Amino acid sequence: MALLPILEFPDPRLRTKAVPVDAAEVTSQAFQTLLDDMFHTMYEAPGIGLAASQVDVHKRFMVIDISDEKNLPQVFVNPEIVSKQGEQLYQEGCLSVPGIYADVSRADAITVRYLDRQGQPQELHADGLLAVCIQHEMDHLDGKLFVDYLSPLKREMVRKKLAKQRKHVA
């Protein structure tokens, strides 16, 4: 398995809107290998979700595993939220915005339709952390980041903090 490079804010490629995946592509060996590489990258980061857009693949799919043991991998291809209920404030972080956390308001429960890893249509009702994670990763597929929910001033502070972090690493 390959470790894929994760794009970091403010990389403009993170703003690219992803295109749908052809259903026939889902079961191809190349797509399955990419999914394995994405899970490997997510687990190593470590994270609980990774959208294809974050690894510079601008197609509508993402991988998620919110389990503590990292043994419940979920694949969402062409996800679509069909209903939302309630609202919750949740502190979010992001592999593309390392070291930054902020409160974001999201639907508390959602119903999402998608294709699974085998290309089969599924519908899932999710709440709590899973609902937040799905919404967060779907934002990536639309070229949106959790920092977009922040005020312009806070967003600029995040950009400067990340630039400073990168300078110290270089």
UniProtKB/Swiss-Prot annotation:
Pfam families: Pep_deformylase. This is Peptide deformylase 2. The active site is at residue 137. GO terms for molecular function: metal ion binding; peptide deformylase activity. It comes from the Bacteria. Its EC number is 3.5.1.88. The keyword RNA-binding does not apply. Gene3D superfamilies: Peptide deformylase (3.90.45.10). It is an enzyme of class 3 (hydrolase). Binds 1 Fe(2+) ion. Its cofactor is Fe(2+). Fe cation binds at residues 94, 136, 140. The gene is def2. Belongs to the polypeptide deformylase family. Removes the formyl group from the N-terminal Met of newly synthesized proteins. Requires at least a dipeptide for an efficient rate of reaction. N-terminal L-methionine is a prerequisite for activity but the enzyme has broad specificity at other positions. One of its GO terms (biological process) is translation.
